[in-house]
Amino acid sequence: MSLSIIFMGTPEFSVPTLRLLVDAGHRIVAVYTQPPRPGGRRGLDLQKSPVHQAAELLGLPVFTPVNFKDPEERERFAALKADVAVVVAYGLLLPEAVLNGTRDGCYNGHASLLPRWRGAAPIQRAIMAGDAETGMMVMKMDKGLDTGAVALTRKVEIGPNMTAGELHDRLMQVGAKAMAEAMVKLEMNDLPLTPQPQDGVLYAAKIDKAETRIDFARPALDVHNHIRGLAPFPGAWFELEIGGKPERVKVLGSELAEGQGAAGELLTDDLVVACASGAVRLTRLQKAGGKPLAAADFLRGTPLAAGMRLS
């Protein structure tokens, strides 16, 4: 036996779930993903989403509505007569007509331990807040923002130096397995739902460019969490005066270090920077238009000395 599934997702994070559902023998009757976006060096080429590309390689039908406001779009969804819809980082709001448009509703894979970090950026926010643990949850969607009842939980430890990129890749695989397991249980009519707690609700707002600059006038642990929570994208950054003009440098890796000094002061020649309390060592950096480099390689091209100030 197998389920007939509508899959809804867009980025790379969603692809392993789609592939695992196909490998499990489920019938994917349609794949919904966001429309192609301008891309390429000049933004002239329309680029299909990772899910769109994966679906085409799997020979699956793909739909790319801008939204579900058009009644015909909602009718097309319902006409698929699927058992269930699986939603993983789709990126579009689903009206009630879609949420209720399959036999068993819509199940979402969300990258946090709900109700903590509902919303758009749960991976980054968990690290930026210094959380030691997160996870993947499969929930049955309702009309609220990540408020649905929970069907399955898989916890994941966040290492002290783990970046958002590393956690993304770990949760991507954990989430795929969790959703595949949930669909087996759903098919067996053995997927009980538990309402989310009323306490502990936090919202993971989308990352704003204005918050990406590093503030070395914060404690070292906060600076370290800020850096790794934004690595590799969009990247936390500081400004450095090179050749008489300020240049933006992204920091893609850091670790806590010993030392005290004025906030932003380079304490050593190997990129230990003083914070409000304590210090951080910058381990991976990237200048505008350049490649990410380990600290030693970065210093070969951009000599920095103790006593300089980063801002």
From Swiss-Prot:
The Enzyme Commission number assigned here is 2.1.2.9
InterPro entries according to UniProt = Fmt, Formyl_trans_C, Formyl_transf_N, Formyl_transf_N_sf, Formyl_transferase-like_C_sf, GART_AS, Met-tRNA-FMT_C, Met-tRNA-FMT_N
- Gene Ontology, cellular component aspect: cytosol
Task: Report which residue ranges the record marks as coiled coil.
Answer: none
As its record notes, the protein acts as a catalyst of:
L-methionyl-tRNA(fMet) + (6R)-10-formyltetrahydrofolate = N-formyl-L-methionyl-tRNA(fMet) + (6S)-5,6,7,8-tetrahydrofolate + H(+)
Q: Which Gene3D superfamilies match?
A: 3.40.50.12230
Alphabetically list the UniProt keywords: Protein biosynthesis, Transferase
- UniProt-annotated binding residues for (6S)-5,6,7,8-tetrahydrofolate: 112-115
Using the UniProt record, name the top-level EC class of this enzyme in a single word: transferase
User: What GO molecular function annotations does the UniProt record carry, in alphabetical order?
Assistant: methionyl-tRNA formyltransferase activity
- Which PROSITE patterns would you find in this protein's record? GART
Which Pfam family, giving just one, matches this sequence?
A: Formyl_trans_N
Q: Which HAMAP family match?
A: Formyl_trans
User: What is this protein's function?
Assistant: Attaches a formyl group to the free amino group of methionyl-tRNA(fMet). The formyl group appears to play a dual role in the initiator identity of N-formylmethionyl-tRNA by promoting its recognition by IF2 and preventing the misappropriation of this tRNA by the elongation apparatus.
**PANTHER family, A to Z:** METHIONYL-TRNA FORMYLTRANSFERASE, METHIONYL-TRNA FORMYLTRANSFERASE, MITOCHONDRIAL
NCBIfam families recorded for this chain?
fmt
Q: Which family does it belong to?
A: Belongs to the Fmt family.
> Protein name, please?
Methionyl-tRNA formyltransferase
What is the organism of origin for this protein?
Rhizobium leguminosarum bv. trifolii (strain WSM2304)
Give the gene name. fmt
